[in-house]
Amino acid sequence: MRTSSRRLHRFNPGHEAAVGIGQANYTPDAASRRMADDLETLPLWYADSGDSVWITHTEGADQFLDSLPLFLRPDVRLLAADALCRLSADVEGPLLATPWGLSPDVLAAFERLRRRGAPILVPTWSDALRTLTHRQTAARCLERVLRRLPELPPVAVPRFCASVGEVVDYVTTCQAPFMLKTPFSCSGRGILTLENTSITDPERRWIEGALRRWGVVSIEPKLDKTADFALEFHSDGHGCVTYAGLSVFDTHPRGAFTGARLGDPDRLRGQLPDILRGPLFDRLRTAVTDTLCDTVGRIYSGFLGVDMLVYRRPDGSAAVHPFIELNLRYTMGLVAVELSRRVVHPDAIGRLLIARCPAPGDALRAHQADSRRLPTHFADGRLRAGCLSLVPVTPASLFRAFIEVV
């Protein structure tokens, strides 16, 4: 991945909620904290040569690195806070703080580390970044992309409601089912599906709780989805947004990411539905790129992803929703793009998988079973077949991140 200087990465999933709260002392929910803990070494696989990753569990991380074949081992350092504070700025030069997603709390953590002596440059938080992270920005981008692609069938732009009454008005005048979303959420979180035009008591309580916390919720028709995909980009912060790759991924019914396909970019594009195998794909990529240049290009610097989907229309024909979600952060799709480029053999097809196990010990047993079932085989310095873990798996782990190539 392109960078202008060496970086210090930090994996902080679920940062959207932290952006919404806007407090430097924000504490993520338990699931986000556990995911950040178990998958803290994931930046190894998208960081540039010479970068570093700020981690907590150095012993397990060192053992994990030692377990990788030398030809596959990233030229990236895994450093705990004390080791970072011992680095010399004169020798090392400053490292640019680069979290998975920018938010006030993670930047405050980097700043505390800098004050302890770590030679790092910490970006300044801007309220403009909060505005861009709000789902209203994605809604505005959707409108602009639709204007640039008049050949697409119209899709409903999300409506933002500030009261239960406004939600009721929407559902009683439109056709069910519906998707309700909180303004700072992603990957299936903060989403409620309304299957009918009448709102149940539990659904009303969910809406009331979301409104108390966030002030608004968005609502839109739920589409008959047949495929998920995303386009990944990089913004230089000076008005230039460039295409970084295609992600074809899978989700739980509620929308949470479960896995992304890996392989040669042309072969991945060939896995898209027929509607995207012609000129529409390139027109879509151009329209979204131009929209992002206008919207985020001079405010945000870094990688980002735009989630999209293919859906079935009432007449049975396929159509594209060109802008479901804007992710101003590194994404699992970007991780998949880099794994396809760096790790997976060009003749192989695989999947990046994120799995959550119910209890400590389950993840380690699953990892051991997968390693026996799919032993790794390498060719030309790349993974040709097998199951490769991307993070250490310990008896305490709940989350796993791994590649399967079969």
Language-model segments: residues:
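N-terminal-proximal low-complexity accessory segments that begin disordered
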Residues: 2-52
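Glycine-rich phosphate-binding loop of ATP-grasp-fold ATP-dependent ligases
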Residues: 157-158, 177-203, 230, 253-271
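ATP-grasp fold ATP-binding core
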Residues: 171-193, 215-225, 325
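Phosphate-binding site of ATP-dependent enzymes
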Residues: 203-258, 309-312, 316-323
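A long amphipathic alpha-helix within ATP-dependent nucleotide-binding catalytic cores
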Residues: 214, 243, 255-318, 356-383
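Glycine-rich phosphate/pyrophosphate-binding beta-alpha loops
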Residues: 252, 323-337
